[in-house]
Amino acid sequence: MKTTFLDFEQPVADLEAKIEKLRFVQDDSAVDISEEIARLEAKSQTLSKNLYAKLTPWQIAQVSRHPQRPYTLDYARHIFTDFVELHGDRTYADDKAIVGGLARFNGQSCVVIGHQKGRDTKEKILRNFGMPRPEGYRKALRLMRLAEKFGLPVFTFVDTPGAYPGIDAEERGQSEAIGRNLYVMAELKVPIITTIIGEGGSGGALAIAVGDQVMMLQYATYSVISPEGCASILWKSAEKASEAAETMGITAARLKSLGLIDRVVNEPAGGAHRDHRAMAQTLKRALQDALRQVADLSPAELVEKRLERLMSYGRFKEQKVA
């Protein structure tokens, strides 16, 4: 698949285009230009690395939405074995914006749940652009209760602009479905490991993100509203999205410093979309470590620590100024 470059990656895109032309020339010529191609490839990697080392929050938001980033089903294929997808909420329908099922993680049975976006137009519509309806959250809830029944750890992968705001979703109880998930996940008696792999959009993300260990990929985002939405409210213009992203603190590094997540998982040079397999292997090691930290806790200890974690959000200390 040909790499899609973002606007700020144009210098890299130009260099890659030049490399592609040289490859074409080499295929049709007796002249050996492999050294020149290798030199330009090294230059491209260095340029990309330097570019990504100083991304702004708004640029990170764009990377988190990159159409070629690995999605939940990609990680299910690369990290887990024997994945069997389960469908439906047993109440209304099967929401394709959330996928989930049984799998094995290093030989251990587990449950995998996550948002799923589409690659092409047809799949994007099928997946509703990764925006779940109530039946999607109720499907996730059904799988979490199944995990609790059989004592299986739960791995959740978050990547959504937010819960679907359509009238049909509201009629079927969107807010109740999200609230119910938060309530049940807070007291689920099995380990929950959550990873924000792309966009973490508001309650639509949080509904499968109440975990014992919460991680974020390096160029993922997590926020109560999109930068464009925030800018439209505060400045009456989505053109202020860059300023909003800076103000909101949506990046993994910022959220780690605030204690809202436990770990930042580094991405390959140029982002996770550049190398799905490398990203999956890095994430697998992080998941192993996260599960190891909670695997030996009793159900009561899991719930106690999870509730303590939730209640710690927003705490602050007052200091008197002399």
UniProtKB/Swiss-Prot annotation:
User: Which coarse location class describes where this protein primarily resides?
Assistant: cytoplasm
Entry function: Component of the acetyl coenzyme A carboxylase (ACC) complex. First, biotin carboxylase catalyzes the carboxylation of biotin on its carrier protein (BCCP) and then the CO(2) group is transferred by the carboxyltransferase to acetyl-CoA to form malonyl-CoA.
User: Is Transferase included in the keywords of this UniProt record?
Assistant: yes
Write the signal peptide boundaries. Answer: none
The GO cellular component terms are: acetyl-CoA carboxylase complex
Q: What is this protein called?
A: Acetyl-coenzyme A carboxylase carboxyl transferase subunit alpha
Listed PROSITE patterns: COA_CT_CTER
Gene Ontology terms: biological process: fatty acid biosynthetic process; malonyl-CoA biosynthetic process
What InterPro entries does the record point to?
Acetyl_CoA_COase_a_su, ClpP/crotonase-like_dom_sf, COA_CT_C
Q: Which GO terms describe its molecular function?
A: acetyl-CoA carboxylase activity; ATP binding; carboxyl- or carbamoyltransferase activity
**From which source organism is this entry?**
Aromatoleum aromaticum (strain DSM 19018 / LMG 30748 / EbN1)
Assembly, in brief, is: Acetyl-CoA carboxylase is a heterohexamer composed of biotin carboxyl carrier protein (AccB), biotin carboxylase (AccC) and two subunits each of ACCase subunit alpha (AccA) and ACCase subunit beta (AccD).
